[in-house]
Amino acid sequence: MAEISLRDVRKSYAGIEVIHGVDFEIADGEFVVIVGPSGCGKSTLLRMVAGLEEITAGEIAIGGRVVNRLEPRERDIAMVFQNYALYPHMTVRENMAYGLRIAKLSKAEIEERVARSATMLELGQLLDRKPRQLSGGQRQRVAMGRALVRNPAAFLLDEPLSNLDAKLRVQMRLQIKELQRTVRTTSIYVTHDQVEAMTLADRLVVMNAGVAEQIATPAEIYDRPATTFVAGFIGSPAMNMLPARGLGDALEVAGQRLAVPAPAGRDLILGVRPEHLHAAGPEEPGFELHVQAVEWLGADAFAHGRLADGTELVLRTPGKAPVRERDRLKVAPDAAALHLFDAETGRRL
C-alpha cells in the first residue's frame, strides 16, 4: 500500500490545456473516487497516474516516489477497466495468474495468491471456466481478481461497472466496498455515476472541465457544496437553484422576502434540495408552485413545476400522498438547509 500525491498536475493537447493544475493527496489505504460528467478529464487524470498518458506539467508520486518518467509496469499499480480485458482463450485461473507468471513468481506463490483472491471474490467454482462462459458480473470479478493477486501499491479502476445492468451494479458496488474494507489498498476509482461515487468513496474529487471543483467526503460535498456545479451535479434530482438578491438582513427570491442574511445589493443564487422544501403555513413566507409533472417512485414522489417568475422547482413528497399535476402549492425552504452562492462566480458564500 502507498500514499499517492498529485501536485499541480496539468495536461495539454496541441497547446490546449485540458487538465488545469490538479492538487490532492491520497492517504495510504484511502479509497478516492473521481467523479464528473463526460469530458471533464477524470479518465485522463487516472491515465496520467497509471503512466498511460504523459504529464505536461506537475508531479505525481506513489509511495513517496516521483513516477513522472516511470513506465506503467514500474509504478506498482494494478488497473481494472470497464471492458474487463480478459484473455478469451485462457481460463479464469490462467487469466488471474498471467501477470504473476510474467513476473516469474514461483508456482506455489501463484497458486496461493490465486486461491486467496478467488475465495475473496467468490470465484472458486469458476476457476476452470473461460470468459465466454461467464456473466458480465463474473467477468468483472475476474478482472478485479487479476488486479488483486498482484498485491499492488494501488488500484486504479476506470468505470469498472458501466457495462453492467442496474442489479449487477448494486451487487458489484457492495462487493467492491467489502473488498476495500478487507484489503485496505490505496485506490482511485473513476465514474460518472454519482451513486457509485457517494456510496464507495472515503473522499470525492468532483471534476468539471479539467478542474477539481471540490475534494471532500461525500457527506461534506452533499451538505456543503463548494460551487453551483457541485451542488447541481451531486444529488438526484439536482439541487434547486433560484436567482436571488441580497438585502442585508434578508434575501429576495421570486418576489418573496426570506429572513436570510445576505450581502446587500449582491446578485446571488439560493440553493435548496428537493427534500428541504415543505408545504408552507398560512402566515409563512413561501413560493407558489404550479405543478407540471409528478414522478412517482413508490416511497417518494418528485413534483416538477414552476414558480410565478418561471423558475423551475422540484419538490420531494411522500409517495403515499403525492401531489397531482396542475396542483398549485405554497412551498417554503427549510431555513437550516439553505445554500447561498455568488451568482457571478458560482462559489459558495
Curated annotation (Swiss-Prot):
Its EC number is 7.6.2.10. It catalyses: sn-glycerol 3-phosphate(out) + ATP + H2O = sn-glycerol 3-phosphate(in) + ADP + phosphate + H(+). It comes from the Bacteria. One of its GO terms (biological process) is carbohydrate transport. One of its GO terms (molecular function) is ABC-type glycerol-3-phosphate transporter activity. InterPro entries: AAA+_ATPase, ABC_transporter-like_ATP-bd, ABC_transporter-like_CS, ABC_transpr_MalK-like, ABC_transpr_MalK/UgpC-like, Mo/tungstate-bd_C_term_dom, NA-bd_OB-fold, P-loop_NTPase. It is found in: Cell inner membrane. It is a peripheral membrane protein. CDD domains: ABC_MalK_N (cd03301). Gene3D superfamilies: 2.40.50.100, Nucleic acid-binding proteins, P-loop containing nucleotide triphosphate hydrolases. PROSITE patterns: ABC_TRANSPORTER_1, ABC_TRANSPORTER_2, UGPC. Keywords: ATP-binding, Cell inner membrane, Cell membrane, Membrane, Nucleotide-binding, Sugar transport, Translocase, Transport. Residues 4-234 form the ABC transporter domain. It is an enzyme of class 7 (translocase). Transmembrane segments: none annotated. One of its GO terms (cellular component) is ATP-binding cassette (ABC) transporter complex, substrate-binding subunit-containing. ATP binds at residues 36-43. Belongs to the ABC transporter superfamily. sn-glycerol-3-phosphate importer (TC 3.A.1.1.3) family. Part of the ABC transporter complex UgpBAEC involved in sn-glycerol-3-phosphate (G3P) import. Responsible for energy coupling to the transport system. NCBIfam families: PRK11650.1. This is sn-glycerol-3-phosphate import ATP-binding protein UgpC. It comes from Cereibacter sphaeroides (strain ATCC 17023 / DSM 158 / JCM 6121 / CCUG 31486 / LMG 2827 / NBRC 12203 / NCIMB 8253 / ATH 2.4.1.) (Rhodobacter sphaeroides).
